Amino acid sequence: MNVVDLFCGCGGLSLGFEQAGFDILLGIDHDKAALDTFKANHKGSEIIHGDIQTITTNDIRRIIGGKNVDVVIGGPPCQGLSLSGPRKFDDPRNQLFLSFVRVVKDLKPTYFVLENVPGIISLFKGEVKNQIIKEFSDLGYVVDYKVLNSAHFGVPQVRKRAIFIGVLHGEGPVKFPTPLIESEKDFITCQQAVSDLHGLDDDVMPESFEYASSPLSAYQKLMRNGAPSKLNNHLITKHQEKVKSTIALVPEGGNYKNLPENFVSTRKFNVAWTRYHSQKPASTIDTGHRHHFHYKHNRVPTVRENARFQSFPDSFVFLGNKTEQYRQVGNAVPPLLGEAIAKVLKK
């Protein structure tokens, strides 16, 4: 089955579909560094760098050689949608979503998968959610939605995403994946995710070097399957001693509230500061790299550690500068979540 990814980023959702046996025909994104990463890791896929609003369906058909498209996937912003008052088609926040609708209308795939932040479900008292459903229902799709937690699907991170799935009328019901891990006590932990990676916090390690040990968990074995012997994207940030001493004040699983009272009143700190817990999944990975701390070492996680928390295999290499790499990882849909969704469509 063939897939077109309209807001592909570095390709987390596409990778999940690929792991489930789908063919990724094309990725489209305006972020050059993310698209470079997408192309490097999806070598058989075509790419278009540009604004989806200016890319026509004919452009897409030409690039993919007229092949049939079975699934359109992507995560367009939907915050501008509301049923209250007149539809503001010129609202710039609506244009990317409407471009997604346009491509689905023209390509008429059997399925579409639209992902977004969980808050989209309740935004404007549910009006945005209702508008999303209406737009695709008018095109002949049966649409349903669900908020899925990545941790239920083997990802060592508590990351919730709103997933809308549409099935062309007459092609069957909408299905969602069943959690692979039901109980929180069985979630994949931070330690299970990254304990085989060098964790030194007193030295800047080279960009590429060997693993600290053989795989210490089933998850690590999965992440290292097919990976080269040298590890990429594991450049450790060298913090100043003052920063390291501050991080050291945050206990495992703690946050800024655990800082001493005299520190809070005299020093700069960030309310987003959180230290991961070795025996729990990571909290939601963001696009920056200054708010979360390693569960053991007095530093921020590396790009590779964040990628592990997102379920990117070690064979997946991120391009661009370090800030761009962190952004790509933080913006991505965890591949294992994408794979679980894709497998349901394939049944």
Language model segments and positions:
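Core alpha/beta nucleotide-donor-binding catalytic domains of modification enzymes
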Residues: N2-K108, P118-S122, E127-N130, S137
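Aromatic-acidic/polar surface patches that form glycan- and anion
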Residues: L6, I121, K125, F153-Q157, ...
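Proline-centered helix-kink/hinge sites
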Residues: K43, P76-P77, P109, P156, ...
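Class I S-adenosyl-L-methionine
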Residues: N58-K67, L83-F263
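Short, small-residue-rich loop/turn micro-motifs
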Residues: I73-C78, L168, H289, P313-D314
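C-terminal target-recognition/interaction regions appended to catalytic cores
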Residues: P215-K347
